[in-house]
């Protein structure tokens, strides 16, 4: 019989004056575990509102029996409705990464650059697409047009190609994966990327709060908000 899943989350506003990340986790009636992380943008009021509204709408849709795509649609619609006619929320939006995990399978949907990592045997693998400019910039390194340092510090690296803003979505990533016995899943905001992938993998054996603390310990100036939701098999 397949084991169940358990999860925990932690977050910190880092070196920013406010927190724009939101997250949630729910156990559903069929035993599935739902988790979601949203990283808002659009200033204090806008970013925080967008991520909170998106998380609430997404969770509500899934709890009412909807699929992941229904959750994303409701989240996108809710962000658009909330911003309509409110100048202080103009241009607000959020990333979104959500999973449903049950037994030996994870299903996910995502928009934006918030990573979904799978950790197995100490190796970290990002399994969702990155909808920022980072993949295109990294491709220039492979073509010899930029150095790795230039790519890492490129001013457009974190520019999003897609976000949940109430507009039609042209980029959405979704998929599923069979899971081995000792894997862990990490849903994160991109603030975690202050750490290198081997550092994230090493910290994944510890509680989610320890990974957040490792990010803060790196001492990056103006550290972005960081959120980590860690899922693992219940023992």
Regions found by a protein language model. Give the residues of each.
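PP2C/PPM-type serine/threonine phosphatase catalytic domain
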Residues: 1-235
